Amino acid sequence: GVPCLCDSDGPNVRGNTLSGTYWLAGCPSGWHNCKSSGPNIGWCCKK
C-alpha cells in the first residue's frame, strides 16, 4: 500500500515517519482510521 501520515506522526510529511497505509475503499477489518482530517478520497489507516 501507499504510506500516509497519521495524526500521531506529526503535522506534515516532511521529516516524519508515515505510519499509516492509504486505502481507497476504507480501512480493512482490524484496521482503524488514523487521520481525523483525511484526504478527500480514501482513508489513512493503521493496524
UniProtKB/Swiss-Prot annotation:
Highest taxon above the source species: Eukaryota
Matching InterPro entries: Anenome_toxin (IPR000693), Myo_ane_neurotoxin_sf (IPR023355)
Annotated disulfide bonds: C4-C44, C6-C34, C27-C45
GO cellular-component term (any): nematocyst
GO molecular function: sodium channel regulator activity; toxin activity
GO biological process: regulation of signal transduction
Keyword check for Disulfide bond: yes
Subcellular localization, as worded in the UniProt entry: Secreted; Nematocyst
Keywords per UniProt: Disulfide bond, Ion channel impairing toxin, Nematocyst, Neurotoxin, Secreted, Toxin, Voltage-gated sodium channel impairing toxin
Coiled-coil regions listed: none
Function description: Weakly inhibits voltage-gated sodium channels (Nav).
Family: Belongs to the sea anemone sodium channel inhibitory toxin family. Type I subfamily.
Protein name: Delta-actitoxin-Axm1c
Native organism: Anthopleura xanthogrammica (Giant green sea anemone)
Organism taxonomic ancestry: Eukaryota, Metazoa, Cnidaria, Anthozoa, Hexacorallia
